[in-house]
Amino acid sequence: YKQLVVKHQQNTLSFDNTTSFNLDEYLGIDENSSQSYRQFMNENLFDHVDINKNKTFLPTCNQGENPREQGLAYENSIKEAGGIDLQILGIGANGHIGFNEPTSSLASRTRIKTLTQQTLDDNSRLFKEDEFQPTLAMTMGIATILDARYVLLMATGENKAKAVKDMVAGPLSAMCPASSLQLHENAIILLDKAAASELEDQDYYTWAHDQNIKINKEFGLYHNY
């Protein structure tokens, strides 16, 4: 997000015609809380660029609202906007994308998910000791993510290496939700060396990437953004 802000400040990138749909949001937490994803997006991106905040959406379900109806409403909002052009993802140490934890249906849509203990432990560093940490979240489903025209997943650090290996080279499995990206025809996986350390065919992936760029340049399909 810092790089996007810099490009905007340099007048090389505008968000004036952008609609944003966040992957997920905690339940039971105020959107103005420092731990909410709404606040995170405001502080790290939205407050610093020319995006219309009326066109920034997060999946929410407040007390008294019907979770199924809220999930369907979010899905409909995405469809009405013309779908998602670029889905930006991270990956959890257990292979989750969004808050689609292991055993999530590969056909899932936006809904409430209970967070695993591993996810709670990994995210506990973001909460103060006496601060409420939600155990539930509203998240886009795996099928929702796969509907995007392009997917960019970024991972850094050795603690993500096992999940990255399972995602890229393991079987398609609900136990590693990120493995569903094997089905996407326009998925880009961006890794540092630590996150890629358990991949057995790193040299091949590097060679194939370079060859792909070369071929696309020859056919005039390559764009350096």
Summary of predicted features, one role per range:
Residues 2-13, 37-39, 43, 102-112, ...:
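A glycine- and small-aliphatic-rich helix-loop capping segment at beta-alpha/alpha-beta transitions
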Residues 11-86, 203, 208-220:
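Ligand-binding beta-strand-loop-alpha-helix segment within the catalytic cores
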Residues 22, 59-60, 88-91, 153-156, ...:
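Short beta-strand segments
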Residues 26, 93-96, 102, 158-159, ...:
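Short glycine-rich anion-binding loops that position phosphate/pyrophosphate groups of nucleotides
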Residues 69, 98-103, 108-110, 163-167, ...:
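A short secondary-structure junction signal
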Residues 77-102, 220-225:
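A glycine-rich beta-strand to alpha-helix segment
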Residues 94, 98-142:
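Class I SAM-dependent methyltransferase SAM-binding "motif I" and its flanking Rossmann-like core
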Residues 143, 149-225:
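ATP/nucleoside-binding phosphotransfer catalytic cores, i.e., glycine-rich phosphate-binding loops
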